[in-house]
């Protein structure tokens, strides 16, 4: 699912990182203080748009310093906010779908799968993973542009907990958009998902991803 700033994001070889979930009063100097110890900073771009959660791009002279910054600051508690720090993913193709998650090849897939509907326009796979891992370890997450998402859990009991406890819960994207989402089993077509205009049948799931899937190793912190 693309966001309002998807066209500003680049690849990971230029030393640039994305910093999200920043406090509303953040300044460029604050970002410099957060990241200077990882290496020489070439540029800081702070995006503080009215009514949205601020985010920024920080560019290091050495791409290896960018990797260190991600390792050291992703998930870091900064004031009342937990930072999200990652490489900007390259967007391309019609519709702006992401290509090439940094997490590498599939580490594990699971049959313990749920579908999610009602995601806000700026909701990303990372937002979905963060929300749904309240039920347990997520090994796969993906989204598409019509507000649908798919999540796979490592354990059946976590999937069952998500179906019971995360259905009709308030979801918040990295840009501050909120909505109440529905969570249901993959083979269900509940909650108004409409079939394509072609009238095609025979699919086990109403979900069809148009972008690269995103895998998560249960042995790495996110």
From Swiss-Prot:
- Covalent cross-link (Glycyl lysine isopeptide (Lys-Gly) (interchain with G-Cter in SUMO2)), residues: 37
Query: What are the recorded GO MF terms, alphabetically?
Result: protein domain specific binding; RNA binding
The protein's UniProt keywords, in alphabetical order, are:
Isopeptide bond, mRNA processing, mRNA splicing, Nucleus, Phosphoprotein, Repeat, Repressor, RNA-binding, Ubl conjugation
Biased-composition ranges, Low complexity, are 190-199
Domain RRM, by residue range, is: 15-90, 112-188
The protein's location, in the record's own words, is: Nucleus
Sites of the modification Phosphoserine? 190, 194, 196, 205, 209, 212, 217
Q: Where does the record place the region Interaction with SAFB1?
A: 189-201
Quote the SMART domains the UniProt record gives. RRM
Question: What residue spans carry the region label Disordered?
Answer: 190-222
Q: Is Repeat given among the entry's keywords?
A: yes
Q: Does the keyword Chaperone apply?
A: no
Gene Ontology CC: one annotated term: nucleolus
One Gene Ontology BP term is: mRNA processing
InterPro entries per UniProt: Nucleotide-bd_a/b_plait_sf, RBD_domain_sf, RRM_dom, RRT5_SRSF_SR, SRSF9_RRM1, SRSF9_RRM2
Q: After translation, how is this protein modified?
A: Extensively phosphorylated on serine residues in the RS domain.
Function per UniProt: Plays a role in constitutive splicing and can modulate the selection of alternative splice sites. Represses the splicing of MAPT/Tau exon 10.
Could you identify this protein by its name?
Answer: Serine/arginine-rich splicing factor 9
Q: Which organism is it from?
A: Mus musculus (Mouse)
Gene behind this chain? Srsf9
């Amino acid at each position: 699912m693309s966001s309002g700033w998807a066209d500003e994001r680049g690849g990971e070889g230029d030393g640039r990182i994305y910093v999200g979930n920043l406090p509303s009063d953040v300044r460029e100097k604050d970002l410099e203080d957060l990241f200077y110890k990882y290496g020489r900073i070439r540029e800081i771009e702070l995006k503080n748009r009215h009514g949205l959660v601020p985010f920024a791009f920080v560019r290091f002279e050495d791409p290896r310093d960018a990797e260190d910054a991600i390792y050291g600051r992703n998930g870091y508690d900064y004031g009342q906010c937990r930072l999200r720090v990652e490489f900007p993913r390259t967007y391309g193709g019609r519709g702006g779908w992401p290509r090439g998650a940094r997490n590498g090849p599939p580490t594990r897939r699971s049959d313990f799968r749920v579908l999610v509907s009602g995601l806000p326009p700026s909701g990303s796979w990372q937002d979905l993973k963060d929300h749904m891992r309240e039920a347990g370890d997520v090994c796969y997450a993906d989204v598409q542009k019509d507000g649908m998402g798919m999540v796979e859990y490592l354990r059946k009991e976590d999937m069952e907990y998500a179906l019971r406890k995360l259905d009709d819960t308030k979801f918040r994207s990295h840009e501050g958009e909120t909505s109440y989402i529905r969570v249901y089993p993959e083979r269900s077509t509940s909650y108004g998902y409409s079939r394509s205009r072609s009238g095609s049948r025979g699919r086990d799931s109403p979900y069809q991803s148009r972008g690269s899937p995103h895998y998560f190793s249960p042995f790495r912190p996110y």
